[in-house]
Amino acid sequence: MYNSLSALPYIPYNILVYLAHQEVAEDLWKLLKYNSYDALSKPNLTFDQKLELIWRNGPQEKFGVFFTPLVEDAICESKCVLKIYDYYIHAKELYNSTVVYAFDFLYGGQMSLVEYNGVPVSRGDLFINKAMAVLNGAEVGGVGKLTFLDDMSRYALGRATIGNSKTFTGVQLFLAVNVGDTGEEYGCES
């Protein structure tokens, strides 16, 4: 009985629920929900409004949060999209693996800037700043905490310019957490 990664399917949702409960993440939700330059001056979302942004099935254009790297019909040119998914799984030992989660934050070129503390800033830079402030060190259902640390994974990084470079752009942030268990018992002996 070795690591079966039993917590793996739940971690993206756990991350989102954690973000929805954190008061310090309100600006992050506003960046996602409101497309305007003054997005941060808009009202906070309720917990239910935040979770209603999650796409579950069917047409995607009404939603802003996805647990898959493939988003087929959510139009990034006209709104912000957040994708949270496991990017890389590295087996460290029999009972423990490092899982790297990707956070893709996409938005149209016309909404690239927001006002923050009276100055124009990059929506992508502010997303990375707010995500790091809330998630770096968060308990999300793994073994230990979600971290931005090269010692945990060489994939822990942030980078700009994802998208099609013509009508939408964005940023990517990679955070890692250990996931492990003693597995589920299968085999000839069971």
Task: Annotate each language-model stretch with its function.
Residues 1-93, 190:
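Small/polar-rich, solvent-exposed N-terminal microdomains that initiate assembly or binding
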Residues 45, 71-82, 109-146:
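Acidic, Ser/Thr- and Gly-enriched intrinsically disordered low-complexity segments
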Residues 75-76, 90-97, 162-168:
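Short, solvent-exposed beta-strand/turn "edge" segments of beta-rich domains on protein surfaces
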Residues 82, 99-103, 171-173:
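Hydrophobic residues positioned within well-ordered beta-strands of beta-sheet architectures
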Residues 88-90, 105-111, 176-183:
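Beta-strand elements of well-folded, non-transmembrane domains
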Residues 96-115:
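Short acidic, glycine/tyrosine-flanked loop/strand segments centered on an H-E-D-like triad
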Residues 121-180:
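Acidic-leaning, charged glycine-interspersed low-complexity segments
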Residues 183-185, 189:
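Aromatic/basic-lined ligand-recognition segments
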